[in-house]
């Protein structure tokens, strides 16, 4: 890069990222296998519409959200604006897919005459979706929309990082609640008899937890954070000077 050599990538980081992706892709594939083998598959205009809900939520609020959080670790030496745009786009895709999953479950309940929003899973799910949408909206306003000042972005950034990790953790927990609810609703007493579907779903739950743990571990390693590039620091100082009247040497 111009203005200085690119920072080297920590030796172990690519292996942890690759492992997280292996877990995530296996998670998505196993979710599809569970729905195909034991739940009849997915179809929008039938009683299989409900099955779109778990698949969409796993793809959107687990896999894509996790990958969006890892963007700043994976693309450590790319242009900051490019990384921001990719981070935001992955979150948009996750949000849209999750919205499809929400529509599927509410529409299915309406057609079948089931009550809505009575379980802990549903309450947590709505909370996660609302928080995720607000997080994306505020993040866009602060970091992609050009109106926010540098000092305002700097003050908000720690909150953005904290709530991003928290919402992801809540998403994993909510998915685990939903998985258990789906198993108990269908299998009931047979669940304790080690039914094949129950065993497969238990493995799916372990994959959910492991993927969440892998993503959070990568995020919390301070030595794996994206290093500040020289030109980014210069642009930040220039922007602050223009918007607040400070001099670059006032820090």
UniProtKB/Swiss-Prot annotation:
Entry membrane topology: Multi-pass membrane protein
Class of the enzyme per the UniProt entry, highest EC level: translocase
Binding site for L-ascorbate: 80, 84, 153
Annotated residues for binding of heme b 2: 73, 80, 87, 160, 225
Binding site for heme b 1: 53, 116-119, 121, 181
Subcellular location: Cytoplasmic vesicle, Secretory vesicle, Chromaffin granule membrane
Gene Ontology biological-process entries: ascorbate homeostasis
Function text: Transmembrane reductase that uses ascorbate as an electron donor in the cytoplasm and transfers electrons across membranes to reduce monodehydro-L-ascorbate radical in the lumen of secretory vesicles. It is therefore involved the regeneration and homeostasis within secretory vesicles of ascorbate which in turn provides reducing equivalents needed to support the activity of intravesicular enzymes.
Protein's name in the database: Transmembrane ascorbate-dependent reductase CYB561
Higher taxonomy: Eukaryota, Metazoa, Chordata, Craniata, Vertebrata
